[in-house]
Amino acid sequence: MRGNIAQLMQQAQKMQENLQKAQEEIAKIEVTGSAGGGMVSVTLTGAKECRKVRIDPSLASDPEMLEDLIAAAFNDASNKIDAESKSKMGSATAGMQLPPGMKLPF
């Protein structure tokens, strides 16, 4: 019994270290989402902070279209961050025996 608990504690510590490393890696990435065939692009960090927005000048005459494209480009970048985060977090917990139904990140 004690061996199982010690092993579980070691496993938890290793997983915590891996998760922290993955979170640090995620914070450093930048991704760009785009919409309208590249007429609008939004660059976000792993923490989903906006770094850059690029808008094709031809869209200035259609504010409603521009609003939709900015939102779509932001959502595209956000989805890319989510996918990258899921991948890195999955790698961080690879080989760890989690209880049934427990998913990471929490």
Swiss-Prot record:
Record's SUPFAM superfamilies? YbaB-like
Q: Which HAMAP family match?
A: DNA_YbaB_EbfC
Subcellular location per UniProt equals: Cytoplasm, Nucleoid
Subunit-level organization: Homodimer.
Query: Which NCBIfam families does this entry report, sorted A to Z?
Result: DNA_YbaB_EbfC
Q: Where is this region: Disordered?
A: 81-106
Question: Keywords assigned by UniProt?
Answer: Cytoplasm, DNA-binding
Q: Which Gene Ontology molecular-function terms are recorded?
A: DNA binding
Asked if the keyword Coiled coil belongs to this entry, the reply reads no
Function text: Binds to DNA and alters its conformation. May be involved in regulation of gene expression, nucleoid organization and DNA protection.
Q: Does the keyword Nucleus apply?
A: no
Which cysteines pair up through disulfides? They are: none
The family annotation for this protein states: Belongs to the YbaB/EbfC family.
Enumerate the InterPro entries for this protein: YbaB-like_sf, YbaB/EbfC
Protein name per the record: Nucleoid-associated protein Smal_0858
Q: What is one GO cellular-component annotation here? A: cytosol
**Annotated organism of origin:** Stenotrophomonas maltophilia (strain R551-3)
